[in-house]
Amino acid sequence: MEIQKVTDASFKKYGRVLEGYTVDRILKEMEHTPLPKDVIYVPSVEEMEALPEAEAFQNRAYGGLPIQIGYCNGDNNKLNALEYHRSSEINIAVTDMILLLGAQQDVKDDFTYDTSLVEAFYVPAGTAIEVYATTLHYAPCTAVEGGFRCVVILPAGTNTELTFPIGENGEDKLITAKNKWLIAHEEAGIEGAFCGLQGENITL
């Protein structure tokens, strides 16, 4: 599978590289986060949200909406699932990492998706990117030995536990957390998830 760069023109339909943001303190804070052999996701870390840098992301990237700053760390080389939100997600690569991305527009009416349409993008350490709301994405893949660390910025409450009942029909069956619609691959064995990814469970 060809691994493209986030600076390539082909990335423009999925997101953009963010310029003019200071991320040094956020990167420093990430040094204290765990790096497990599997994948861990923490939606909100108060220490990072209290940094002055957080205010810039809240005001400039989200137009003043309340945000949460968390992380996704680990060691991963498989697609396993794809998710989307009703809002852009900002990722800051603490280490080099690879993102497997798709377009929501390619999801079929029955909410299945052909994994042959997925594209891979290399994100170098220190890079901040915006991943558009219509971009299918999931956990990063490891690009360097030892795993990856990735900052995840989203509107407050995203990816947190549901506090309301959800339907079983249409797009409702994809909701697995607040502001999170997930399509899983059967091989991933994600409990309770709709398995609509068809084709290879891509491995890098």
Specify the residue positions occupied by each region the protein language model found.
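Active-site region of the double-stranded beta-helix
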Residues: 1-125, 139-147, 151-204
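Histidine-centered metal-chelating micro-motifs
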Residues: 127-129, 134-138
